[in-house]
Regions:
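Surface-exposed, low-hydrophobicity beta-strand/loop segments enriched in small/polar/acidic residues
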Residues: 1-120
Length: 120
């Protein structure tokens, strides 16, 4: 079952914000929807698992956008990233953390994650 979790982003005067998509979830990160609202174009987003720090997405979208994050698997022989393949990103019993920079002075937007919790 795909779960939808959202949070409103409200920046401080310096354009920064940190929000958490709650509650904790376990599953595959299927998609991320960024709705810019009044946030500045080129707002920096860094999205990770709160506990593990697993990288989910880093981007500076110019406007509202959908993302389908994937990771590069590592080669068994030397640990180097395999550039020709991708694998799903999972979170386990944690919230998703969204760190925002350069979003503009006290502006708002929305971040939504779609988690496929039937992967277990």
């Amino acid at each position: 079952m795909i779960e939808e979790i959202s949070a409103t982003i409200t920046t401080a005067a310096d354009g920064s914000a940190t929000v958490y998509l709650s509650p904790t979830y376990s599953g595959r990160v299927h998609a991320i929807k960024y709705t810019a609202g009044t946030l500045d174009a080129g707002t920096d987003l860094v999205i990770t698992g709160e506990t593990t720090g697993v990288a989910i997405l880093t981007d500076s979208p110019a406007a509202s956008e959908w993302f389908y994050p994937r990771a590069f698997p590592n080669q068994a022989t030397d640990g180097a990233a395999e550039a020709d393949a991708t694998c799903d990103i999972y979170i386990v019993k944690e919230r998703i953390k969204v760190v925002v920079a350069q979003g503009g002075n006290t502006l708002t937007g929305t971040i939504t994650a779609y988690i496929d919790s039937n992967q277990w």
